[in-house]
Design a protein with these regions (language model features):
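PAPS-dependent sulfotransferases, especially Golgi type II membrane carbohydrate sulfotransferases
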Residues: 13, 17-19, 33, 52, ...
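PAPS-dependent sulfotransferase catalytic domain
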Residues: 1-91, 101
Length: 188
């Protein structure tokens, strides 16, 4: 769900304080500046459109929400598709790397309720509006229901702040890109 991706990316800068204390402060700041609902919405859209180009019998698509609700069943399907042996230990992953939860090396497994977090807060009506506006066709195709958020004052704020966001994000990411224009074209 692109709205859950939005919420995760909005909180990504907090990783340093949720157990990933080796992340430099500069990287946390860069993650905070990189977040904007229009940017993240466009990135999600571009990645979904790119994946849809490769739909054939050699590709298996599994929605994140489906996987975490039935991890055992979905992993068996994936292993069968890949023609590899299934082992239940494959699901014993460390619970680390979340933008919303503290790392817990003692806890293993899949968080089965780690979806639709955007419904319980964390995103404004404006963020939800832009996410759905930019992704409505792809969301519908993948079976995600629209929240029917409406254009509001906060939506206008995100629209007018977008050019400034792009400038600051480019400045903080220049060293990470070989060719700025090629990098932008690939992602949008």
């Amino acid at each position: 769900d692109p709205r859950d991706v939005l919420l995760s990316q909005k909180s990504k800068w907090k990783r340093k304080f949720l157990g990933a204390d080796k992340i430099p402060l500069k990287e946390s700041i860069r993650s905070w500046v990189n977040y904007h609902p229009i940017t993240i919405g466009k990135l999600w859209n571009a990645s979904v459109r790119a994946s849809l180009k490769f739909q054939n019998s050699n590709i298996k698509t599994v929605l994140f929400e489906e996987f975490i609700q039935c991890p055992d069943q979905k992993l068996k399907e994936i292993c069968s598709f890949l023609n590899i042996s299934y082992d239940s230990e494959m699901l014993d992953v460390e619970q680390a790397g979340s933008s919303n939860f503290r790392d817990d090396s003692k806890e293993k497994g899949i968080r089965k309720n780690n979806f639709e977090k955007w419904k319980t807060g964390g995103l404004s009506q404006g963020e939800i509006f832009w996410c759905e506006f930019l992704n409505r066709d792809e969301m519908s195709l993948l079976g995600y229901e629209l929240f029917s958020s409406k254009f509001s004052l906060i939506s206008i704020y995100y629209l007018f702040s977008f050019p400034f966001h792009i400038i600051f994000a480019l400045m903080l990411n220049l060293s990470r890109m070989n060719n700025v224009f090629s990098s932008i074209k690939k992602r949008i």
